[in-house]
C-alpha cells in the first residue's frame, strides 16, 4: 500500500472511530458461520466504498479475523484480501460487475488448480448505514455516482451509530473449483451471484418500501371484497353507501399500522438503554435460519408464545439487531390507548379486536388489510394464543388469524409464506403477580397509562431474557403434502373457504405450538423453581438443591427434549447463585448449613416459571413416579402404562413425540436415570435405588399434580359413564379446587378451566367418551386404577370420597351426552 493511501486511511479511520459504532451480525461469526481461521479468507463487498472497507476492518480486528487491508500470499502469489463487486450507483440501473472483480475471482480460482490442498474461504460482507426503506410515493432520479460520496458522508454523520456489518455464510472456492471449474465463465458467475446475494440481503434487512397510508386505504376500498361488504353494511343497517364507506375507513384507521423507520431508530436507542439496565442479557438462538428464509425471499410470519406485554418490544428489538426488518405486529385493541397506541402503531403494530363475531365489515376489512401486508412483502407477527398465558403454559391456539393467512395464500401470491414459531422466555415476568390474582378470580384491570406507569415503576432486575427461533413451517410445503389440490381454490379476488381449510388450520396451529415448545429455554429460575416446588415444604438444603439441579441438567443434556431446546451453560452452583440474586428465594442459615426456602407468597408465582419447561421434564418425571409408587416395575409394564397416559400429556403440553415412538423415547430416559443411579435395572425390572430416593422423589413430583388432575376426571367418568362433557369439565374443576384446598396445592393451573377442557377433548379423541353414547365403564375404571396407583393414599382417598359426594349432589347421574 502506498504511503499517501496509508495516510488517507489513517485520517479516515480517525473520523470513523468517532462517528461509527457498528453491530456485527451474527454476533460471533467465527462460531456461528463455522469460519476456519487457519484457512485463507477473501472478503467480498458489494460497492466500492472505503468507509465500508474501514468499518469492516475495525470489526475484523475486534473479532480477531484477518485484516482485509493485508494481502493474501499464497504459493508466492500476492492478491488483495478484499474485492468490491461494483463501483457503486450509476445513472443506469443495469450494469455488469467490475472487470477487476471478475479478474480477482479468476486469480483466486486459478490458485486452486495447482494446489489440491488449498481451500480459500470467500466471505460476503455487507456494511449498512441506516435501514430506511423509503416510501412508495417517493419518486426520485437514480442516484448519480458523483453524489455517492456526499451521501455517504451524511449517512455516516447521521447513522454511524445505526450501522451493521453483516457476515454471510462462507463459500468454499475449493468446492467451486472442483465442481464448476476455474475458467473466466465461473468467475463471472461468482460475481453475478454475489450481486444477487447482496440485493436479497438488502431487501431482507430493509424490507419493501412503506406505503402511503391514504393510498393504501384507497386501494383497500377499491377491492371487490370490501366493496361488497360496504354494500351489505349499507343494506343491513339502512344507511347510505357513503356512510358505510366512512365506517370502513374508520375501521382501517383503527386497524392499520403507521410504520416509520425514525420511530424504530428512536425506540432502538430507548430499548437498548432499557434492556441494559433491566436485563442481564438477551439470549438469542437459531436466528440464522430466519435470516436465510428472509434472504431466500420467504414471506415470514412470526408466531411467538405470549408471556408478557414485553414480548412485542423484545422480539422486534431482537429482529432489528439480527439484521432483519421488524414485523408488522397484530396487537390487541386493548393496547390502543394514549400514548402506547400511537407509539406501537409507528413501530409496526396493527390492532385487532378480541372477536370478529357479528361484524362482517370489520372481519372483511381486517382480512383484506392482512392480505395486503402479505402481497406487499411485509413480515407479520401475531400471537396464536390470542392473549398472554396466565399460567406459564402454552394456551390452546386461536386460529382466526392463521385462517386469514391461508386465505391470503389463496389469492395466488408469488412469495412462499413461512411460519416461524418463536419461544420467548423470561426469568422474571413483570405481570406475574397480576396473573396470579386473575387466576384467583380478580377482574382483569384494563390497560391504561396509569397502569403502564405503575408497571414501569416496579421494573427492577429482570435477569435473563430468551428468544429462541423454532423450526419453520412452510405453508406451501405443508399444503403440498397434506392438501395436494389446494391450488384449485386459488382466487385472486374473492376470499375462499374451501372444505379442507378448517382442519388444515387446526393441524398447522397445533404444529406451531409444538414447535414453540421444542425451542424452549431452560434457565436458572425455572430449574430452581421446579426443584423447590417439588419439595412439599418448598424448602431444600443447598446441597439437595444443587444435586437436583445437576440431575435436571444431566437429563436435559444427555437426553435432549429437542434439538432447538436450549440449556444454560453454567454449573449448578452458578445457576443457584444467579437465581438467589433475583430475590425470589430466602436463605436461612443454621449450624448444619444453608436452607433455600421458597416463601409461601412466592410459591404460586414460581409455578409460572416451572410451567415454562414442564414439558421438557415430564416424561422423566413420569418414569420416576412409576418406579417410586410401584417400588419395582418391569420395563414392559412401565411402557404400557406410559402409553396410556402419554396422549393426555402430549395434548396438554404440546409435546412433539409421536405416541408410536414412545418406547424409543423412554428407553434413553430410563438409561440416563440408571446412569445417574436414581434407579436400578435388574432382570429388566426397574427398582428404586435407596441412597438416591430423595432426588427421584423430587423428579417424580414434576408430574404429580398432572396425574392427580387426570385421576379426578377418570374417577368421575368411571363413576358416571353417561356424564356430559360439559358436566365432566365442571365437576372435575370443582373437585380439583376442593383437592387444592385440602392438600395445599398451590399451582393455579391445577383447576384451570382450559386445562380440563383440553383433557376432556383428548378423552373424546382417544375414544374414552363420544358424542352419542356412554363411556365404557370398565375401560375408564381400569385407567383410573392405573392413575390412582401413582397417587399418595391420602390424595386417592380424597378424590374417591369427594367424587362420590359430587355425584350424589347431582343426583347420581347427568343424562346429557358424553
UniProtKB/Swiss-Prot annotation:
It catalyses: sn-glycerol 3-phosphate + an acyl-CoA = a 1-acyl-sn-glycero-3-phosphate + CoA. InterPro entries: GPAT/DHAPAT (IPR022284), GPAT/DHAPAT_C (IPR045520), GPAT/DHAPAT_LPLAT (IPR041728), GPAT_PlsB (IPR028354), Plipid/glycerol_acylTrfase (IPR002123). Pathway: Phospholipid metabolism; CDP-diacylglycerol biosynthesis; CDP-diacylglycerol from sn-glycerol 3-phosphate: step 1/3. Its EC number is 2.3.1.15. Keywords: Acyltransferase, Cell inner membrane, Cell membrane, Lipid biosynthesis, Lipid metabolism, Membrane, Phospholipid biosynthesis, Phospholipid metabolism, Transferase. The HXXXXD motif is essential for acyltransferase activity and may constitute the binding site for the phosphate moiety of the glycerol-3-phosphate. SUPFAM superfamilies: Glycerol-3-phosphate (1)-acyltransferase. It is an enzyme of class 2 (transferase). GO terms for molecular function: glycerol-3-phosphate O-acyltransferase activity. It is found in: Cell inner membrane. A motif (HXXXXD motif) lies at residues 305-310. It is a peripheral membrane protein. One of its GO terms (cellular component) is plasma membrane. GO terms for biological process: CDP-diacylglycerol biosynthetic process; fatty acid metabolic process. It comes from Edwardsiella ictaluri (strain 93-146). Belongs to the GPAT/DAPAT family. This is Glycerol-3-phosphate acyltransferase. It comes from the Bacteria.
Amino acid at each position: 500500500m502506498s504511503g499517501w493511501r496509508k495516510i488517507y486511511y489513517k485520517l479516515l479511520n480517525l473520523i470513523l472511530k468517532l462517528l461509527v459504532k457498528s453491530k456485527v451480525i451474527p454476533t460471533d461469526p467465527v462460531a456461528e458461520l463455522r469460519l476456519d481461521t487457519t484457512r485463507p479468507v477473501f472478503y467480498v463487498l458489494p460497492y466500492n466504498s472505503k468507509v465500508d472497507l474501514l468499518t469492516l476492518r475495525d470489526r475484523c480486528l475486534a473479532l480477531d479475523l484477518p485484516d482485509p487491508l493485508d494481502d493474501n500470499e499464497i504459493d508466492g502469489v500476492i492478491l488483495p484480501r478484499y474485492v468490491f463487486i461494483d463501483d457503486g450507483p450509476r445513472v443506469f440501473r443495469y450494469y455488469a460487475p467490475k472487470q477487476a472483480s471478475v479478474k480477482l475471482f479468476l486469480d483466486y480460482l486459478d490458485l486452486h488448480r495447482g494446489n489440491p490442498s488449498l481451500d480459500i474461504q470467500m466471505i460476503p460482507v455487507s456494511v449498512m448505514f441506516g435501514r430506511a426503506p423509503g416510501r412508495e410515493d417517493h419518486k426520485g432520479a437514480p442516484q448519480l455516482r458523483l453524489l455517492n460520496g456526499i451521501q455517504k458522508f451524511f449517512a455516516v454523520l447521521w447513522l454511524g451509530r445505526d450501522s451493521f456489518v453483516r457476515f454471510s455464510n462462507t463459500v468454499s472456492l475449493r468446492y467451486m473449483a472442483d465442481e464448476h471449474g476455474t475458467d473466466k465463465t465461473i468467475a463471472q458467475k461468482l460475481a453475478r451471484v454475489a450481486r444477487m446475494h447482496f440485493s436479497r440481503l438488502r431487501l431482507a434487512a430493509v424490507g419493501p418500501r412503506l406505503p402511503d397510508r391514504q393510498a393504501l386505504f384507497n386501494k383497500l376500498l377499491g377491492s371487490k371484497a370490501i366493496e361488497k361488504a360496504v354494500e351489505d353494511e349499507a343494506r343491513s343497517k339502512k344507511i347510505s353507501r357513503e356512510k358505510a364507506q366512512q365506517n370502513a375507513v374508520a375501521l382501517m384507521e383503527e386497524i392499520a399500522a403507521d410504520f416509520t423507520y425514525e420511530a424504530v431508530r428512536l425506540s432502538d436507542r430507548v430499548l437498548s438503554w432499557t434492556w441494559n439496565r433491566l436485563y442481564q442479557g438477551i439470549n438469542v438462538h437459531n436466528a440464522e435460519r430466519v435470516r436465510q428464509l428472509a434472504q431466500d425471499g420467504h414471506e415470514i410470519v412470526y408466531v411467538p408464545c405470549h408471556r408478557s406485554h414485553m414480548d412485542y418490544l423484545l422480539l422486534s428489538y431482537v429482529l432489528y439487531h439480527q439484521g432483519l426488518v421488524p414485523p408488522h405486529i397484530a396487537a390487541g385493541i386493548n393496547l390502543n390507548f394514549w400514548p402506547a397506541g400511537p407509539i406501537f402503531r409507528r413501530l409496526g403494530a396493527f390492532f385487532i379486536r378480541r372477536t370478529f363475531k357479528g361484524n362482517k365489515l370489520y372481519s372483511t376489512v381486517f382480512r383484506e388489510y392482512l392480505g395486503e401486508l402479505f402481497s406487499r412483502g411485509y413480515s407479520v407477527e401475531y400471537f396464536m394464543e390470542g392473549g398472554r398465558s396466565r399460567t406459564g403454559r402454552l394456551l390452546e391456539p386461536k386460529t382466526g388469524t392463521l385462517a386469514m393467512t391461508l386465505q391470503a395464500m389463496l389469492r395466488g401470491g408469488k412469495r412462499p409464506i413461512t411460519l416461524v414459531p418463536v419461544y420467548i422466555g423470561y426469568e422474571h415476568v413483570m405481570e406475574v403477580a397480576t396473573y396470579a390474582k386473575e387466576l384467583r378470580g380478580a377482574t382483569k384491570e384494563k390497560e391504561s397509562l396509569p397502569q403502564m406507569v405503575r408497571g414501569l415503576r416496579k421494573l427492577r432486575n429482570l435477569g435473563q431474557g430468551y428468544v429462541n427461533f423454532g423450526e419453520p413451517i412452510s405453508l406451501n410445503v405443508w399444503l403440498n403434502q397434506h392438501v395436494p389440490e389446494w391450488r384449485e381454490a386459488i382466487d385472486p379476488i374473492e376470499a375462499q373457504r374451501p372444505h379442507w381449510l378448517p382442519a388444515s388450520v387446526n393441524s398447522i396451529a397445533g404444529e406451531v405450538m409444538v414447535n414453540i415448545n421444542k425451542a424452549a429455554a431452560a434457565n436458572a429460575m425455572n430449574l430452581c423453581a421446579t426443584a423447590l416446588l417439588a419439595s412439599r415444604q418448598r424448602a431444600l438444603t443447598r446441597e439437595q438443591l444443587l444435586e437436583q439441579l445437576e440431575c435436571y441438567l444431566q437429563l436435559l443434556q444427555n437426553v435432549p427434549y429437542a434439538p432447538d431446546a436450549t440449556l444454560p451453560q453454567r454449573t449448578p452452583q452458578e445457576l443457584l447463585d444467579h437465581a438467589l440474586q433475583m430475590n425470589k428465594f430466602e436463605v436461612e442459615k443454621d449450624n448444619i448449613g444453608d436452607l433455600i426456602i421458597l416463601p409461601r407468597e412466592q410459591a404460586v408465582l414460581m409455578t409460572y416459571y416451572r410451567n415454562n419447561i414442564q414439558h421438557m421434564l415430564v416424561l422423566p418425571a413420569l418414569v420416576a413416579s412409576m418406579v417410586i409408587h410401584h417400588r419395582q416395575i418391569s420395563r414392559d409394564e412401565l411402557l404400557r402404562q406410559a402409553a396410556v397416559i402419554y396422549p393426555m400429556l402430549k395434548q396438554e403440553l404440546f409435546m412433539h413425540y409421536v405416541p408410536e415412538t414412545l418406547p424409543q423415547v423412554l428407553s434413553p430416559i430410563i438409561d440416563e436415570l440408571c446412569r445417574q443411579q436414581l434407579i436400578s435395572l435388574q432382570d429388566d425390572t426397574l427398582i428404586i435405588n435407596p441412597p438416591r430416593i430423595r432426588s427421584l422423589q423430587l423428579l417424580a413430583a414434576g408430574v404429580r399434580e398432572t396425574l392427580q388432575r387426570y385421576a379426578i376426571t377418570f374417577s368421575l367418568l368411571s363413576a358416571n359413564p353417561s356424564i356430559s362433557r360439559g358436566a365432566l369439565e365442571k365437576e372435575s374443576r370443582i373437585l380439583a379446587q376442593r383437592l387444592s384446598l385440602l392438600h395445599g396445592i398451590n399451582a393455579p393451573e391445577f383447576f384451570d378451566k382450559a386445562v380440563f377442557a383440553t383433557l376432556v377433548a383428548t378423552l373424546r379423541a382417544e375414544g374414552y367418551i363420544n358424542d352419542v353414547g356412554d363411556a365404557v365403564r370398565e375401560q375408564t375404571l381400569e385407567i383410573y386404577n392405573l392413575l390412582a396407583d401413582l397417587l399418595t393414599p391420602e390424595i386417592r382417598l380424597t378424590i374417591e370420597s369427594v367424587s362420590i359426594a359430587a355425584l350424589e349432589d347431582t343426583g347420581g347421574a347427568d343424562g346429557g351426552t358424553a
